C-alpha cells in the first residue's frame, strides 16, 4: 500500500514563533512587533502572488523588518536585523509536534515539511528543532517564484513528490494556506 502524504506548513504550524517575542520587543520596544512583522511578511507574500511579482521570503522578511522599524521609529542596525533573522532558524517545535509526527509516521503516513522559506532555512529550522527524523522530505516553494496559497506551489509539491495533487493533504495553522 502506498503511503499517504501529508504536507506540514512549518512557521507557526510546526515551529513556535513565541520564542522570538522577547527579541522583537527588545529591538522595537513593543509587544506587538513580532505579530506585526509576521503579518507584514505574509501580507507582502500575498501581494506578490496577486501582482505576479517575483521575490523570496528572505527579501520580504528583510523588507518587513525595515517597515516595522519605521513604524516604531527605531534605528534598526544591520546587527540587530541579522540577529532577528538568524533567530528565525532556531525556533522550537510546538510541544505536541514530535509525538504527532511520530504517530503519523508509525501509521504509514509520509510527512513532508513544506514552506515559503528557502530550502536552506527550512533545513536549518528542521535540524535545529530536532525534527530531522520526523520528516521524509523537505520542500521549499522558493523555486516556483511564488508563495502559498498560489496553486502553482501545491502543483510543484505534487510534481516534486511524484504524486497527484489530490493525494496530498496539508496541515497548516493559517487557513489561507489551504486555499491553493
How should these model regions be labeled?
Residues 1-42:
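Active-site neighborhood of HAD-like aspartate-dependent phosphohydrolases
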Residues 21, 34, 38, 58-66, ...:
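An amphipathic alpha-helix signature
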Residues 79-92, 97-127, 139-141:
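Substrate-recognition element of Asp-dependent hydrolases with the DxDx(T/V) motif
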Residues 46-82:
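A metal-dependent, Asp-based hydrolase signature
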Residues 172:
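Nucleotide-sugar-dependent
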Residues 23, 45-50, 121-123:
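A short acidic, helix-capping loop that chelates divalent metal ions and anchors anionic groups
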Residues 112, 118-169, 179:
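Substrate-recognition "cap/lid" segment bordering the active-site pocket of phosphatases
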Amino acid at each position: 500500500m502506498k503511503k499517504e502524504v501529508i504536507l506540514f506548513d512549518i512557521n507557526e504550524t510546526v515551529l513556535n514563533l513565541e520564542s522570538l517575542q522577547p527579541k522583537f520587543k527588545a529591538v522595537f520596544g513593543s509587544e506587538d512587533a513580532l505579530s506585526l512583522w509576521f503579518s507584514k511578511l505574509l501580507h507582502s507574500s500575498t501581494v506578490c502572488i496577486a501582482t505576479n511579482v517575483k521575490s523570496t521570503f528572505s527579501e520580504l522578511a528583510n523588507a518587513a523588518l525595515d517597515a516595522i522599524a519605521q513604524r516604531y521609529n527605531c534605528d534598526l542596525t544591520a546587527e540587530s536585523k541579522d540577529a532577528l533573522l538568524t533567530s528565525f532558524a532556531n525556533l522550537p517545535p510546538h510541544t505536541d509536534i514530535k509525538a504527532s509526527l511520530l504517530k503519523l509516521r508509525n501509521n504509514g503516513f509520509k510527512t513532508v515539511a513544506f514552506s515559503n522559506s528557502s530550502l536552506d532555512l527550512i533545513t536549518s529550522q528542521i535540524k535545529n528543532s530536532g525534527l530531522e527524523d520526523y520528516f521524509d522530505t523537505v520542500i521549499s516553494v522558493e523555486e516556483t517564484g511564488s508563495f502559498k496559497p498560489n496553486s502553482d506551489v501545491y502543483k510543484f509539491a505534487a510534481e516534486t513528490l511524484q504524486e497527484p495533487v489530490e493525494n496530498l493533504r496539508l496541515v497548516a495553522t493559517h487557513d489561507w494556506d489551504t486555499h491553493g
